[in-house]
Amino acid sequence: MSTNRRFDPNFTPYVVNSMGPKTPERARVVLGALIRHIHDFAREVELTSAEWMLGVEFINSIGKISTPIRNECHRICDVIGLESLVDEIANKIVTEDGVSPTSNVILGPFWSPNAPFRELGDSIIQDPNPNGKVTYMHGVLKDMETGAPIVGAVLDIWQASANGQYDFQDPNQSENNLRGKFRSNEKGEFNWYCYHPTPYSLPTDGPAGVLLNLMDRSPMRPAHIHLMITHPDYATVINQIYPSDDPHLDIDSVFAVKDDLVVDFKPKTDDPKAQLDLEYNVTMALKKHHPNPNSAPPVSSFERFNKASKTQEKL
């Protein structure tokens, strides 16, 4: 904070205390902290009127470019790391013994509630891409403390195709291509066929692109497979699974890479349906360990898909 004595030390408390008695308590806490930090930021950098107006215009531009299927504010929060930070605050689990489950990361905007259930061993590839490398993905779900298999968990997987586009972005893909839900068996096992993921760039035609360019940062996202795992007794796990040889791991534009989510894809020679093999085991924590055990999983900004609307966005 600036120590410049020109600034009235009573101004910020005056603004915070202007909230009336009917303000909900949580809103009072959140808005009060927000006002204090924004005021401290302005004092610290001694924000000029021109810079303030530039910020106002930038915020306006976020709203102007957003549509029902393009949430630019969501993307801005991603590129400044806010969504990843909120996810860490909301979902980080560490027991008193220092035990943690498989890491949680951001959901991203392109999860769909409409993915169909498939049988173990099925493929989520409905529209083959000639550049796609078919992968046999398999693993076991276990309790992080006991190691017991977790039976009947729902594993919801989705990914972009080999062209870097999700199903509803690409008119050549059918609905729910590269999406599916599976249930773990009596041994906690799961398996299916998918693609080795493909890296892609965030859209750079809007405010997020302007901001990334200003900060001299790459818009690239490393290749990843999305996975959300739910069970009535366990805290939800949301993953993005990354190939260890992806060149963008250290410069992920949304700061979602975590060490235990980086995996090795290995050649597969004993299965005519797959070129690669991915073993990915997951540990889950009982809900009692979650900081907010009754919280619902996050909902995608684009939960309501409109198949008639095709865009060129990527995230």
Swiss-Prot record:
InterPro entries in alphabetical order? Catechol_dOase_N, Intradiol_dOase_C, Intradiol_dOase_core, Intradiol_RC_Dioxygenase
**What Pfam family does this protein match (any one)?**
Dioxygenase_N
* Chain sites annotated for binding Fe cation: Y166, Y200, H224, H226
Q: Name one GO biological process term.
A: catabolic process
Induction context: Expression is induced in the presence of caffeic acid, p-coumaric acid, p-hydroxybenzoic acid, protocatechuic acid, and benzoic acid.
User: Bias regions of kind Basic and acidic residues — which residues?
Assistant: 304-315
- GO terms for molecular function, please? catechol 1,2-dioxygenase activity; ferric iron binding; protocatechuate 3,4-dioxygenase activity
Phenotype when the gene is knocked out: Abolishes growth on benzoic acid, benzaldehyde, benzyl alcohol, p-anisic acid, p-anisyl alcohol, m-hydroxybenzoic acid and p-hydroxybenzoic acid; and reduces growth on p-coumaric acid, cinnamic acid, protocatechuic acid, p-coumaric acid, and caffeic acid.
- Enzyme Commission number(s): 1.13.11.3
The reaction(s) this protein catalyses? 3,4-dihydroxybenzoate + O2 = 3-carboxy-cis,cis-muconate + 2 H(+)
Q: Which coenzymes or cofactors are required?
A: Fe(3+)
Described function: Intradiol ring-cleavage dioxygenase; part of the benzoic acid degradation pathway also known as the protocatechuic acid pathway. Benzoic acid debradation begins with the conversion of benzoic acid into 4-hydroxybenzoic acid through hydroxylation by the benzoate-4-monooxygenase bphA, and its partner NADPH-cytochrome P450 reductase cprA which act as a mediator in electron donation from NADPH. 4-Hydroxybenzoic acid is then converted into 3,4-dihydroxybenzoic acid (also called protocatechuic acid) by the p-hydroxybenzoate-m-hydroxylase phhA.
Entry protein name: Intradiol ring-cleavage dioxygenase prcA
The species this protein belongs to is Aspergillus niger (strain ATCC MYA-4892 / CBS 513.88 / FGSC A1513)
Species lineage = Eukaryota, Fungi, Dikarya, Ascomycota, Pezizomycotina
Q: Coding gene?
A: prcA
